[in-house]
């Protein structure tokens, strides 16, 4: 699902600037590696579980609504090109 050099557009975030940058970098890598949304989400989730301790949840897609409970300072919703990424920690 190569997004070329798509710019990240952060729509909503409750997360440190450093962690936001990490989320965008991680998502960029995932989009370069995988074509299937489920695989992209799994890659991001596993990376964040490893780097920032479990339990992270990730949703990737072009069209979805959401309403989630998350831990303070552990939420980001952003676009890379046409693809939306919701990443949050809960549990």
UniProtKB/Swiss-Prot annotation:
Name of the protein in its database record: Dynein 8 kDa light chain, flagellar outer arm
Protein family according to the UniProt entry: Belongs to the dynein light chain family.
Subunit relationships: Consists of at least 3 heavy chains (alpha, beta and gamma), 2 intermediate chains and 8 light chains.
Keyword annotations: Cell projection, Cilium, Cytoplasm, Cytoskeleton, Dynein, Flagellum, Microtubule, Motor protein
Location(s) in or outside the cell: Cytoplasm, Cytoskeleton, Flagellum axoneme
GO biological process, one term: microtubule-based process
Species: Chlamydomonas reinhardtii (Chlamydomonas smithii)
Record flagged with keyword Cytoplasm: yes
Family matches, as SUPFAM superfamilies: DLC (SSF54648)
GO cellular component terms attached to this protein's record: axoneme; ciliary plasm; dynein complex; microtubule; motile cilium
Recorded superkingdom: Eukaryota
Family matches, as InterPro entries: DLC_sf (IPR037177), Dynein_light_1/2_CS (IPR019763), Dynein_light_chain_typ-1/2 (IPR001372)
